[in-house]
């Protein structure tokens, strides 16, 4: 409870415990347009829980001047494996840490460190019982640090078939195996950025230098970042972004708006549990 106002604080908004009314709209209401702006868990608190209206955990350490963004990625599906879980988590962690990002809170500059853990869940077996068990776990999950990613031969859940996808600001994704095959690929870090709430930037980044990690395929970029540096800037002859040449930049870190989060006991959250 907030001692000054007498209201309950839930990280994203306040609730009056006397009237049971929320003060302020749900910050993720744009993702659920059919729900009241002031509702809690779709007005269904029996089966749903929303601990803070927001998903990776962000922890501030004032002593070491670091901000740690942590998440656990649970991989399952026809192409998932323990090796994929380990490799993909490492690619995401390394990709985001490559920026050596910083955030300023007040008058203090903090180094941003990403700590990503990968877990594999085998959902094969008789009668699909393991898959059903995982689906139940996903439905009941309220921990915004835990993300569930299905690894498939061909992705179908996104806006474009055949492309890996992740809920914007959410904690569920679908990775197409050939998009993430091999170490050092950038699709994983790109999709994780969506999970943190980031969207695609302008599709024309010519004369803007290094493309950030959120630049999508078919983006127009400076020649050295194209599939074919000698091609004209179009999608016919390799004249668009080679995804292998995008990377996390300080601008991507800035776009997370960590400095705008409301920290309680040194912790806050990016995104939300879906």
Features from the language model and the residues they span:
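Extended, hydrophobic alpha-helical membrane-active domains that insert into or remodel lipid bilayers
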Residues: 54-63, 274
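Fold-level signature of zinc-dependent metallopeptidase catalytic domains
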Residues: 62-85
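Metzincin-family zinc-dependent endopeptidase catalytic domain
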Residues: 83-204
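Metalloprotease/metallohydrolase-associated module, dominated by Zn2+-dependent proteases
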Residues: 168-183, 202-274
